């Protein structure tokens, strides 16, 4: 393997073999290669303090490289080096006016040994309290550090100026001009050189403190004649030797610093200043906000703003961005903002207030210091006098009257190099800080630099047997690979599969090998393919690397004064700021945004409304998105109410306005600050909830370690979903980012489960399967996670008992709220497979995914509570009856639910186009006039013949009437369309009767099933209906059937069924009678028209023997006898059957039908009597559908004959005179050739030719095609019909005279109606002189 070590902008690739070398050996090789890269000789001085991983972890010097780094990883060196422009310590050619200490004079003059070596014991100095009391400010710094160019760093004796160094009076010791040193002259050239140097150092950390006074090139020359030099160096070397013995490490090249864990414990007092404020009862004039570390811990109160003219500004007590960490005896660290405010108010009652303040300049170092502490506290070392002089003698001189207080025991990032002197306690606003190295080489400012991503762990061999449910885990890798490859980690343990059954594999394990195949350099796709290649029932061998996640409890505070009794603990717990109803508490969070900002805050929110008056109740957290800032922060919870965002209150605003405020604040203010401040209201947990170590339930813990259980989980618990499982506060932050976790350690439920305590889920969910076993990363792309519950029978008998609980108000118990990812939810696959003990009792309908914005603005509510489902009314119907659409807002949902509540059991349906007519009474009358029964049955899925007692929502949703399947208008034209010929109709009736019986049986079964399903649980799929309804979806259709309440007993249904069958039988009999009358009327019309010569007056046409040829249906003997009887009644002989029935001419009939339709359209405004009079001239010619009804079956034949005779006698003569002059114009169509031949053979008469030229009929010239021709339309129809009949009469007379009837006379033809080519051909073949002259029209 090989790694890349970055020295500033220079990167060095170091080959490491198999990686079994130690880190300090890597440092040696990297330094050697770096010297070659920058073209320096081996004597060029370089000091490497530490190596940091690219992900932010710090590598220990004695770690094995392969355990803490991967192949092609990038490491960052934090180092110091010799000035690249000049090498020397005051004796080089570039240095003028300076000299090295005398002790090195002989060495430098005799050989080339580097001057950058530790001082000898004879050249040490010791700073004693007596020297310090003599007001000689001794400030030691490294000459190569430019951080204190403007700070006070001077070495002087009593003869030098005693002015206190400050930012206004910067002084430097070493070779700078302006430094008043005896017997030396300053060099401006050296001062300018120091300012223009190109430094290559990085910000320093606490590990460099012990070497800050060592002899190397980072320190300028001291005068050897100074009396304190020898004693100082001797003391410094003793401290270094003790540190090396404790660490037991071999120092790398450049005498690098030792590990942080073995450094002496330093206090916070060197960066904290004490501010004494006499309390005169007035306000201080400061505005404070919570100051939180990036890891989420509260570090104190931040002075955000000073009031103009206030006490703090006038007396120069505070500055902006100062951090108050302690007030009198109260430590403000790790306190919630409400508790800190309470402590502040308590302190304001004292006469004198002591503020422990971290100046704004030290705030960053203080924040880094807080991150490096591992939850360890040390008592009683906040004040300087409580610390041993052997550790830091420079910190021992401070006012003894200062109050004692506990302090942190971890090493700071930057410590002051001088004590706070009594006379300068208020002279300077902040003490001079320790030197800080130049920042240009800062390559990694990762938040998680305190956490070592490459901690030493253990390797495990795990064998998993692949079953039908797979291996049962998912893997992930880095989003951005380093060097082309990335490690593979186990992301989730699925709720089914081999992994959860085995129980050894955990989320976060790194895969090293799969079946002996090394995964180094392999991509995630290759690893997936390798895992999937395992055969069914085969065994896969996994070699995983698991980092040790030991829980580090807080140390107990040993001071009795800091111990707290149970009564005090209770009192402290009562100080929590609660809402007026006492059910919730206020919490303040500073949530840092992600570097990428891809998911934003990463929460989905919802707006709730009151069920009584529909008032807005506020904005609540609906869900927390994995990978977002809130998820990584780990403090925000589902169902938290957002009170304020970035100081802007959301209270009192409408939901929509609050949503807009939330969006705006997150997008603008959050991006500017890099973090979002949230004030939330959270429901107080129950007393039986498990508490983490250090929670208020543990009275033996001190107040400093006492934390609310939520706050404990916020900062320490790595899996906030299940309390009581392996809490690991040192959870790898970088690994969590890779895993997409929200600070949660997802564990297998078979490993490390508590034995004595009941596992409680957050938000008090039911203790069944832990939710982390589901694939949380894909919760937005899957349906609801299913579960198995032991009390399935209880669920099957329950529905929503009170729809008022459907609204989740702030004071509603979240355990009663519908949880989308919670218990009681099933995925679609589980609903289909019915994973319950008794599947017949359950009928779950489909649900759909709820989509939420990443920013999380979604007006949604949570329904279907657990308690409601367990104790519900079986008669409730809150399913599809609400009539909501997919885009239903919260308001429409609440309104619909409220209406259902007010109306009791009245079922709601989607809006219907009209009121559905029932058929519960007077069925005999309806059968006589209603034609809706006449429609033949279609396929079984259609709603054709609905039974009387059922009415489905399907028909109403599609806009149809559910009972009547056709229009209730029994018109002749509609009847012709709906009813086919009698034979087909009889067959359809038989099929319909049979299908109706089968369908009624099916409905009986469905009703029996629905009786058991009246009290069924209706999920969100019933409340919301998404998409179109599919008719073939039997489950949805059966689930939506609503039973009418018209018939309440079985006797009524049986009686109604019999009545229905009787009505249908009468309907069939009535239809057959109509068909017989219709057949008689048509035949009578034909024979009356084509009868003997004495019938011409009322028939309009001669007898036509071939009329029966147009009837497509042969007559039975019974029908023939009936025809004879009818002919006898009208005293007309019945003609014999024609010899040829194939000579049908449908052209005349079609023309008559078209004229009839035109007449009906134009005659709509006339009365019925006029219409009947006009119809008397029409003849019922046969059509291609001879079985169609004529519509005159209720009129007696004799009455028709008498009326027709009388009307024709009155109008025939007048009509004949008018029609003789009516113009005719032949049409040209596709058969123009045949038409021309027709006109040549039959020349028109003289009267007709003259009539064509008559301008009186010009308005009719263009109306031959059936369109309205003008004002004479009705007369034209009547005259044309009469002319047609007259011509047919004449033609029949000629035929009867010239040929016997047995020859089969052809049907009438008209010239103005072009015949088909087949007709023209037949006419040409049959054209003989015996047939007589043709008729013209």
UniProtKB/Swiss-Prot annotation:
Organism: Rattus norvegicus
Similarity-based family: Belongs to the PAR3 family.
Domain PDZ intervals: 271-359, 461-546, 590-677
Chain segments carrying region Interaction with PRKCI and PRKCZ: 712-936
Disordered: region residues: 81-109, 143-263, 397-441, 866-888, 932-1015, 1028-1055, 1110-1271, 1284-1337
Protein modification: Acetylated. Deacetylated by SIRT2, thereby inhibiting Schwann cell peripheral myelination.
Name of the molecule in the record: Partitioning defective 3 homolog
Sequence positions bearing Phosphotyrosine: 489
SUPFAM superfamilies: PDZ domain-like (SSF50156)
Record note on quaternary structure: Component of a complex whose core is composed of ARHGAP17, AMOT, PALS1, PATJ and PARD3/PAR3. Interacts (via PDZ 1 domain) with PARD6A, PARD6B and F11R/JAM1. Interacts with AURKA, AURKB and SIRT2. Interacts with PRKCI. Interacts with PRKCZ. Part of a complex with PARD6A or PARD6B, PRKCI or PRKCZ and CDC42 or RAC1. Interacts with LIMK2 and CDH5. Component of the Par polarity complex, composed of at least phosphorylated PRKCZ, PARD3 and TIAM1. Directly interacts with TIAM1 and TIAM2. Interacts with ECT2 and FBF1. Interacts (via PDZ 3 domain) with PTEN (via C-terminus).
Known role: Adapter protein involved in asymmetrical cell division and cell polarization processes. Seems to play a central role in the formation of epithelial tight junctions. Association with PARD6B may prevent the interaction of PARD3 with F11R/JAM1, thereby preventing tight junction assembly. The PARD6-PARD3 complex links GTP-bound Rho small GTPases to atypical protein kinase C proteins. Required for establishment of neuronal polarity and normal axon formation in cultured hippocampal neurons. Involved in Schwann cell peripheral myelination. Targets the phosphatase PTEN to cell junctions.
């Amino acid at each position: 393997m090989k790694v890349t070590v970055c020295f500033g902008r220079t990167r060095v690739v170091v080959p490491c073999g198999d990686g079994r070398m130690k880190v300090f050996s890597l440092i040696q090789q990297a330094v050697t290669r770096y010297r070659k890269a920058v073209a320096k000789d081996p004597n060029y001085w370089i000091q490497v303090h530490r190596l940091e991983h690219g992900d932010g972890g710090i590598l220990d010097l004695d770690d094995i490289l392969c355990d803490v780094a991967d192949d092609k990883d990038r490491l960052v060196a934090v180092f110091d080096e010799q000035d690249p422009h000049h090498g020397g310590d005051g004796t080089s050619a570039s240095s003028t006016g300076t000299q090295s200490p005398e002790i090195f004079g002989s060495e430098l003059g005799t050989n080339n040994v580097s001057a950058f070596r530790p001082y000898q014991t004879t050249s040490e100095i010791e700073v004693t309290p007596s020297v310090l009391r003599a007001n000689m400010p001794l400030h030691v710094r490294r000459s190569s550090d430019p951080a204190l160019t403007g700070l006070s760093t001077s070495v002087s004796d009593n003869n030098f100026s005693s002015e206190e160094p400050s930012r206004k009076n910067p002084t430097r010791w070493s070779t700078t001009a302006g430094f008043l040193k005896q017997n030396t002259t300053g060099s401006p050239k050296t001062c300018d050189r120091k300012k223009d140097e190109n430094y290559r150092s990085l910000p320093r950390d606490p590990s460099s403190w012990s070497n800050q006074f060592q002899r190397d090139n980072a320190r300028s020359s001291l005068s050897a004649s100074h009396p304190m030099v020898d004693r100082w160096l001797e003391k410094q070397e003793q401290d270094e030797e003790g540190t090396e013995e404790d660490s037991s490490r071999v120092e790398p090249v450049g005498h690098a610093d030792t590990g942080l864990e073995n450094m002496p414990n330093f206090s916070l007092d060197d960066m904290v200043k004490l501010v004494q404020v006499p309390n005169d009862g007035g306000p201080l004039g400061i505005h404070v906000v919570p100051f939180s570390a990036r890891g989420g811990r509260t570090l104190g109160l931040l002075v955000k703003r000073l009031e103009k003219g206030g006490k703090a500004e006038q007396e120069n007590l505070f500055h902006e961005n100062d951090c108050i960490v302690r007030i009198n005896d109260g430590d403000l660290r790790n306190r919630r903002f409400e508790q800190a405010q309470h402590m502040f108010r308590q302190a304001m009652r004292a006469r004198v207030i002591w503020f422990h303040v971290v100046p704004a300049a030290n705030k960053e170092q203080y924040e880094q210091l807080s991150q490096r502490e591992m939850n360890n506290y040390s008592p009683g070392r906040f004040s300087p006098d409580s610390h041993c002089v052997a550790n830091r003698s420079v910190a021992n001189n401070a006012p003894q009257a200062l109050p004692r207080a506990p302090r942190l025991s971890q090493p700071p990032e930057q410590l002051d190099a001088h004590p706070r002197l009594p006379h300068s306690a208020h002279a300077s606003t902040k003490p001079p800080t320790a030197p800080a190295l130049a920042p240009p080489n800062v390559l990694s400012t990762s938040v998680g630099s305190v956490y070592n991503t490459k901690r030493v762990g253990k390797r495990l061999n795990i064998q998993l047997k692949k079953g039908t449910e797979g291996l049962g885990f998912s893997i992930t890798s880095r989003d951005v690979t380093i060097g082309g490859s990335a490690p593979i980690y186990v992301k989730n343990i699925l709720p089914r599969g081999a992994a959860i059954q085995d129980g050894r594999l955990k989320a976060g394990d790194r895969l090293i090998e799969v079946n002996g195949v090394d995964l180094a350099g392999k991509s995630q796709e290759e690893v997936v393919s390798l895992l999937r290649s395992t055969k069914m029932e085969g065994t896969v061998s996994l070699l995983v690397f698991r980092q040790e996640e030991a829980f580090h409890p807080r140390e107990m505070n040993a001071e009795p004064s800091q111990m707290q009794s149970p009564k005090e603990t209770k009192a402290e717990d009562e100080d929590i700021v609660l809402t007026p109803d006492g059910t919730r508490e206020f919490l303040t969070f500073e949530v840092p945004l992600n570097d990428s900002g891809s998911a934003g805050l990463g929460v989905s929110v919802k707006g709730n409304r009151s069920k009584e008056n529909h008032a807005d109740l506020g904005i609540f957290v609906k869900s927390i998105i994995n990978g977002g800032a809130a998820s990584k922060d780990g403090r925000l919870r589902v169902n938290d109410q957002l009170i304020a965002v970035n100081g802007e209150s959301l209270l009192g605003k409408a939901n929509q306005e609050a949503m807009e405020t939330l969006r705006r604040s997150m997008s603008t203010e959050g991006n500017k600050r890099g973090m979002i401040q949230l004030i939330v209201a959270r429901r107080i947990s129950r007393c039986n909830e498990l508490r983490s170590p250090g929670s208020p339930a543990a009275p033996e813990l001190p107040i400093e370690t006492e934390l609310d259980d939520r706050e404990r989980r916020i900062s320490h618990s790595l899996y906030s979903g299940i309390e009581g499982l392996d809490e690991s506060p040192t959870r790898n932050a970088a690994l969590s980012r890779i895993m997409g976790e929200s600070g949660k350690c997802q564990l297998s439920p078979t490993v490390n489960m508590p034995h004595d305590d009941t596992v409680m889920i957050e938000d008090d969910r039911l203790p069944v399967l832990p939710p982390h076993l589901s694939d949380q990363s894909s919760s937005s792309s899957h349906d609801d996670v299913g579960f198995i519950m032991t009390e399935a029978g209880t669920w099957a008998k329950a529905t929503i008992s009170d729809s008022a609980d459907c609204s989740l108000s702030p004071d509603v118990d979240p355990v009663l709220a519908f949880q989308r990812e919670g218990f009681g939810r099933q995925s679609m696959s589980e609903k289909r497979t019915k994973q319950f003990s008794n599947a017949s009792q359950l009928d779950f309908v489909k649900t759909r995914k709820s989509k939420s914005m990443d920013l999380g603005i979604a007006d949604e509510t949570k329904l279907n509570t657990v308690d409601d489902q367990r104790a519900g009314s079986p008669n409730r119907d809150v399913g599809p009856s609400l009539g909501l659409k997919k885009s239903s807002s919260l308001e429409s949902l609440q309104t619909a639910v409220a209406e259902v509540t007010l109306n009791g059991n009245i079922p709601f349906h989607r809006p219907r186009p009209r009121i559905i007519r029932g058929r519960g009474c007077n069925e005999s009358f309806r059968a006589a006039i209603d034609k809706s029964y006449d429609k033949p049955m279609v396929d079984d899925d259609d709603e054709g013949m609905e039974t009387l007692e059922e009415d489905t929502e399907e028909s109403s949703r599609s806009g149809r009437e559910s009972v009547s399947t056709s229009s209730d208008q029994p018109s002749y034209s509609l009847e012709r369309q709906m009813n086919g010929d009698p034979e087909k109709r009889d067959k359809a009736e038989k099929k319909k009767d049979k299908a109706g019986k089968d369908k009624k049986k099916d409905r009986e079964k469905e009703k029996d099933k629905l009786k058991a399903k009246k009290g069924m649980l209706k999920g969100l799929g019933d409340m919301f209906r998404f998409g179109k309804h599919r008719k073939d979806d039997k489950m949805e259709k059966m689930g939506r059937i609503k039973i009418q309440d018209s018939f309440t007993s079985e006797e009524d249904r049986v009686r109604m069924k019999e009545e229905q069958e009787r009505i249908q039988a009468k309907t069939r009999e009535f239809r057959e009678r109509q068909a017989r009358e219709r057949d008689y009327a048509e035949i009578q019309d034909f024979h009356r028209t084509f009868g003997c010569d004495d019938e011409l007056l009322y028939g309009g046409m001669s007898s036509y023997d071939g009329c029966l040829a147009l009837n497509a249906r042969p007559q039975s003997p019974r029908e023939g006898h009936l025809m004879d009887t009818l002919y006898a009644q009208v005293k007309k002989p019945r003609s014999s059957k024609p010899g040829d029935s194939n000579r049908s001419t449908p052209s005349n009939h079609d023309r008559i039908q078209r004229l009839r339709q035109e007449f009906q359209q134009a005659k709509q405004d006339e009365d019925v009597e006029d219409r009947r009079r006009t119809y008397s001239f029409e003849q019922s010619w046969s059509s291609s559908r001879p079985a169609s009804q004529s519509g005159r079956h209720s009129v007696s034949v004799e009455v028709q004959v008498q009326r027709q005779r009388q009307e024709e006698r009155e109008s025939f003569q007048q009509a004949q005179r008018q029609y003789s002059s009516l113009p005719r114009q032949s049409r040209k169509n596709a058969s123009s050739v045949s038409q021309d031949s027709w006109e040549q053979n039959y020349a028109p008469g003289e009267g007709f030719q003259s009539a064509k030229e008559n301008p009186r009929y010009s308005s009719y010239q263009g109306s031959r095609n059936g369109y309205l021709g003008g004002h004479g339309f009705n007369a034209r129809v009547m005259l044309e019909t009469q002319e047609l009949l007259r011509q047919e009469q004449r033609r029949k007379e000629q035929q009867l005279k010239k040929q016997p009837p047995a020859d089969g006379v052809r049907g009438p033809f008209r010239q103005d109606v072009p015949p088909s080519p087949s007709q023209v051909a037949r006419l040409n073949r049959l054209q003989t002189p015996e047939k007589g002259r043709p008729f013209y029209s």
